[in-house]
């Protein structure tokens, strides 16, 4: 069967069908069980981070190296022609695309990754996060982690907590889990950081149940996944940040009565929203989740850059 992801841009999680999501997750599981250090031996991949990143950049670049690819790029756009000389993003991508086989890109501006696809000359662009919009590869590692810990992606109750307005990870994850049957969502956020209406409308259109709550304790005993997010200081004015940052904090005591297999996930970095005593509980799974980023991103790179992938 032909690989449907070969040479495909991955900008939004909505660029992937349910079958394609399942293909990525199946490939990730195979690569986790059976590493392929020469799979991308003759490929060159650009890692272009116009915005600060630790986990996503290092995870992507580690994935590239562990598949044998050569990696070029930057982690600080202020030292590029775009930052120092005023070159446009369009021209930057037009040039980079002549050097490489794929472009992994993070940018603070919503829509920048989609714009890049118009100037990449057919070289696939993988979105590593564009502003508060989309973060599809984080969603892939989230799905991989949920499937590993719960044994399924259907018939789950998922609580999302914290910054649901600017937290691009929860937007992408809600859209992805909406492709699977029987899921239910609980949203716990201050009014100023509520889940965007377009996500709620999407769930309504698909007939997927969701509910709003004011406290973690309201739902902790009924959920399979508790997905925490930090309040993003860089996307709020100081007064708004001070008002909401401590409103939703998870402590170990809050997990009493939780289902035995319930897992607490977090895209990281964690600030104050999960206390360190949670780390010692069997529910804490955010560090394993981060580690799964290697395999999810390896899978995506392998599929995008190999016409016929046989593992």
Curated annotation (Swiss-Prot):
The lineage of its organism: Bacteria, Pseudomonadati, Pseudomonadota, Gammaproteobacteria, Enterobacterales. It catalyses: carbamoyl phosphate + L-aspartate = N-carbamoyl-L-aspartate + phosphate + H(+). This is Aspartate carbamoyltransferase catalytic subunit. L-aspartate binds at residues 85, 168, 230. Keywords: Pyrimidine biosynthesis, Transferase. It holds the Pfam family OTCace_N. Its EC number is 2.1.3.2. Heterododecamer (2C3:3R2) of six catalytic PyrB chains organized as two trimers (C3), and six regulatory PyrI chains organized as three dimers (R2). PANTHER family: ASPARTATE CARBAMOYLTRANSFERASE, ORNITHINE CARBAMOYLTRANSFERASE, MITOCHONDRIAL. Belongs to the aspartate/ornithine carbamoyltransferase superfamily. ATCase family. GO terms for molecular function: amino acid binding; aspartate carbamoyltransferase activity. Catalyzes the condensation of carbamoyl phosphate and aspartate to form carbamoyl aspartate and inorganic phosphate, the committed step in the de novo pyrimidine nucleotide biosynthesis pathway. Pathway: Pyrimidine metabolism; UMP biosynthesis via de novo pathway; (S)-dihydroorotate from bicarbonate: step 2/3. GO terms for biological process: 'de novo' pyrimidine nucleobase biosynthetic process; 'de novo' UMP biosynthetic process; amino acid metabolic process. Carbamoyl phosphate binds at residues 55-56, 106, 135, 138, 268-269. GO terms for cellular component: cytosol. It comes from the Bacteria. The gene is pyrB.
């Amino acid at each position: 069967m032909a690989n449907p992801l070969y040479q495909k841009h991955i900008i939004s999680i909505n660029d992937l069908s349910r079958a394609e999501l399942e293909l990525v997750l199946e490939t990730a599981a195979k690569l986790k069980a059976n590493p392929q250090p020469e799979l991308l031996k003759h490929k060159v991949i650009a890692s272009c981070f116009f915005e600060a990143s630790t986990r996503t950049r290092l995870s992507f670049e580690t994935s590239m190296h562990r598949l044998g690819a050569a990696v070029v790029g930057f982690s600080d756009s202020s030292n590029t022609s775009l930052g120092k000389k005023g070159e446009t993003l369009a021209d930057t991508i037009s040039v980079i695309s002549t050097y490489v086989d794929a472009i992994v890109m993070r940018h603070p501006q919503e829509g920048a990754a989609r714009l890049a696809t118009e100037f990449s000359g057919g070289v696939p662009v993988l979105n590593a996060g564009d502003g508060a919009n989309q973060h599809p590869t984080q969603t892939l590692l989230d799905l991989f982690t949920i499937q590993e810990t719960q044994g399924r992606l259907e018939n789950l109750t998922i609580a999302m907590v914290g910054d649901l307005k600017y937290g691009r990870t929860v937007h992408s994850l809600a859209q992805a889990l909406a492709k699977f049957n029987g899921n239910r969502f609980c949203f716990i956020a201050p009014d100023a950081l509520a889940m965007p209406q377009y996500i709620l409308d999407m769930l309504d259109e698909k007939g997927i149940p969701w509910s709003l709550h004011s406290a973690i304790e309201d739902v902790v005993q009924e959920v399979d996944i508790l997905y925490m997010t930090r309040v993003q200081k860089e996307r709020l004015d100081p007064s708004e940040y001070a008002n909401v940052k401590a409103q939703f904090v998870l402590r170990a005591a809050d997990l009493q009565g939780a289902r035995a297999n319930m897992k607490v996930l977090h895209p990281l970095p964690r600030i104050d929203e999960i206390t360190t005593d949670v780390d010692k509980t069997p529910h804490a799974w955010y560090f394993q989740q981060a580690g799964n980023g290697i395999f999810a991103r390896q899978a995506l790179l392998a599929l995008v850059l190999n016409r016929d992938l046989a593992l």
